[in-house]
UniProtKB/Swiss-Prot annotation:
<dbReference type="Pfam" id="PF00977">
    <property type="entry name" value="His_biosynth"/>
</dbReference>
<keyword id="KW-0028">Amino-acid biosynthesis</keyword>
<dbReference type="InterPro" id="IPR011060">
    <property type="entry name" value="RibuloseP-bd_barrel"/>
</dbReference>
<keyword id="KW-0413">Isomerase</keyword>
<dbReference type="InterPro" id="IPR006063">
    <property type="entry name" value="HisA_bact_arch"/>
</dbReference>
<dbReference type="GO" id="GO:0000162">
    <property type="term" value="P:L-tryptophan biosynthetic process"/>
</dbReference>
<dbReference type="InterPro" id="IPR013785">
    <property type="entry name" value="Aldolase_TIM"/>
</dbReference>
<protein>
    <recommendedName>
        <fullName>1-(5-phosphoribosyl)-5-[(5-phosphoribosylamino)methylideneamino] imidazole-4-carboxamide isomerase</fullName>
        <ecNumber>5.3.1.16</ecNumber>
    </recommendedName>
</protein>
<dbReference type="GO" id="GO:0000105">
    <property type="term" value="P:L-histidine biosynthetic process"/>
</dbReference>
<dbReference type="InterPro" id="IPR023016">
    <property type="entry name" value="Isoase_HisA-like_bact"/>
</dbReference>
<keyword id="KW-0368">Histidine biosynthesis</keyword>
<comment type="similarity">
    <text>Belongs to the HisA/HisF family.</text>
</comment>
<dbReference type="GO" id="GO:0005737">
    <property type="term" value="C:cytoplasm"/>
</dbReference>
<feature type="active site" description="Proton donor">
    <location>
        <position position="129"/>
    </location>
</feature>
<dbReference type="InterPro" id="IPR044524">
    <property type="entry name" value="Isoase_HisA-like"/>
</dbReference>
<feature type="active site" description="Proton acceptor">
    <location>
        <position position="8"/>
    </location>
</feature>
<keyword id="KW-0963">Cytoplasm</keyword>
């Protein structure tokens, strides 16, 4: 299992939002590149980066910063936020991003999404962001009008390589992961699943471990590793030994 430390970028700094609210911001670092390098020193095997400005505006806003992160790390980077056309996706992959996380495009423009998956096989994942199973889009501010389970056959057919599932009600709230929902999701798809939202303690990491055999690839952690309720190095050590 991989624990992906999150570097969420807004206005050029590293922040965390509570439940995706743009006005519920906590700044954790003024230097996202240094923060990314720190997580690598702590044993990270993969970095999760989100361009929050891009997610809310629909266009890339922190390209140079993200390019710098990729160039200064030896571990791979996955990126989401504001990637809504093939040109933007290509630009990021050429800049060194290993794989991309697509949200709105996958829900609203399936033809372009399928074209993107065909152009970059194995590198395009889908972000499924939900409240009570109902998907949200456009930076979590709009109801997508479809459930998580309804969309799965469509994204599989389009050629998606993996799923990141966020329980919005738990994101940034440090309330623990929804193991039952994740288990059900893993059982409904052949794609690897990454959990996001609610990973708050080492106990949450331990609770997710049994799902690895069902298709869970790992979990994204943000708020918890910045506030210290989850010691990232300790979590990595536990995973290595179990």
């Amino acid at each position: 299992m991989i624990v992906f430390p999150a570097v969420d970028i807004k206005d050029g700094v590293c922040v965390r939002l509570s439940q995706g609210q743009a006005d519920a911001v906590t700044v954790f670092s003024s230097d996202p590149v240094a923060q990314a390098k720190y997580w690598e020193t702590q044993g990270a095997r993969y970095l999760h980066v989100v361009d929050l400005d891009g997610a809310f505006s629909g266009m890339p806003k922190n390209f140079e910063l993200i390019r710098d992160i990729c160039s200064q790390l030896s571990i791979p980077v996955q990126l989401g936020g504001g990637i809504r056309d093939i040109e933007t996706a290509s630009k990021y992959l050429e800049a060194g991003v290993r794989r991309l996380i697509i949200g709105t495009m996958a829900l609203e423009d399936e033809e372009t999404f399928a074209e993107l998956c065909a152009k970059f096989p194995g590198q395009i994942g889908v972000s499924l962001d939900a409240v009570n199973g109902q998907l949200k889009s456009r930076g979590w501010v709009e109801d997508a009008g479809i459930t998580v389970f309804d969309i799965i056959p469509r994204i599989e057919a389009a050629g998606a390589a993996f799923i990141i599932y966020t329980d919005i009600s738990r994101d940034g709230m440090q309330t623990g992961v929804n193991v039952m929902a994740l288990s059900e999701l893993c059982s409904k798809t052949k794609l690897p699943v990454i959990a996001a939202g609610g990973v708050a303690t080492l106990e949450d990491v331990i609770n997710l471990q049994p799902l690895v055999s069902k298709g869970l690839e790992g979990a994204v952690s943000g708020q918890a590793i910045y506030t210290g309720t989850l010691n990232f190095a300790e979590a990595m050590e536990w995973i290595e030994n179990n």
